[in-house]
Curated annotation (Swiss-Prot):
PANTHER family: DNA REPAIR PROTEIN RADC, UPF0758 PROTEIN YEES-RELATED. One of its GO terms (biological process) is proteolysis. This is UPF0758 protein SH1266. InterPro entries: MPN, RadC_JAB, RuvA_2-like, UPF0758, UPF0758_CS, UPF0758_N. Zn(2+) binds at residues 173, 175, 186. The keyword Protease applies. A motif (JAMM motif) lies at residues 173-186. Keywords: Hydrolase, Metal-binding, Metalloprotease, Protease, Zinc.
């Protein structure tokens, strides 16, 4: 439907004002950001085209300015507004470790890291550094790319922990496929890191795999009881 043919009360801006943002669809919220259309097409049409072209809302945060401007009706100015809005959305869900977040279970880790890691297109190996009370003091990305047991060196993992005077760590990585089943390499990496941690006096509390809205804890699955 063209925006010009809508009753004023049905326009996205009016509906947001009177009914709240939750009453709007993804395309209507995008239309507000896009603001104006192009010849023969409304901002709502352009918003729908954007969603269809890039396979839905969750992919939009990965788009570059150049990607956004491939949609007719989205020039540099509009692309900058959209990119800024996507980044603000990400930052709103990013946890500030000054909040003194205490880890008591794998689900606590998932609550902190899921929004950051579930949509990453490359594998990331991340370490949460904890103090003696299991409060997160820092998050550090150790590696980006294709992970296997040979590229994750304990030296790099524990160097970060020693530098931060961390008493314990939790390691995480994501599976871009969304499947959180631990691979052989995941298990080998877990065992090696746990054994190195025991020698250094820095406890490895868990290895968590992040997928598409789900996670696997290698502690919960029993892999921390294994030895070579």
């Amino acid at each position: 439907m063209r925006i010009k043919s809508m009753a004023k009360s049905e326009l996205p801006r009016e509906r947001l004002i009177h009914n709240g943002a939750k009453s709007l669809s993804n395309s209507e919220l995008l239309a507000i950001l896009i603001n104006t259309g192009r010849h023969g097409f409304s901002s709502l049409d352009i918003a729908n085209e954007l969603l269809i072209s890039f396979n839905g809302l969750k992919e939009l945060k990965h788009l570059s300015i150049n990607d956004l401007t491939t949609i007719k009706g989205i020039g540099l100015y509009k692309a900058v507004i959209l990119k800024a809005a996507f980044e603000l959305g990400e930052r709103m869900y990013a946890r500030d470790f000054n909040e003194k977040i205490k880890i008591t279970s794998p689900s606590d880790v998932s609550n902190i890291m899921m929004s950051k890691m579930k949509d990453l297109t490359q594998e990331h190996f991340v370490v949460l550094l904890l103090n003696s009370k299991n409060i997160v003091i820092k998050e550090e990305t150790i590696y980006k790319g294709t992970l296997n047991s040979s590229v994750i060196h304990p030296r790099e993992v524990f160097k970060a922990a020693i530098r931060a005077s961390s008493n314990a760590i939790i390691v995480l990585h994501n599976h871009p496929s969304g499947d959180v089943t631990p691979s052989k390499e995941d298990i080998e990496t877990t065992i090696r890191l746990k054994e190195c941690g025991e020698l250094l006096g820095i406890q490895v509390l868990d290895h968590i795999i992040i997928g598409d809205q789900k996670y696997a804890s290698l502690v919960e699955e029993g892999y921390f009881d294994l030895r070579n």
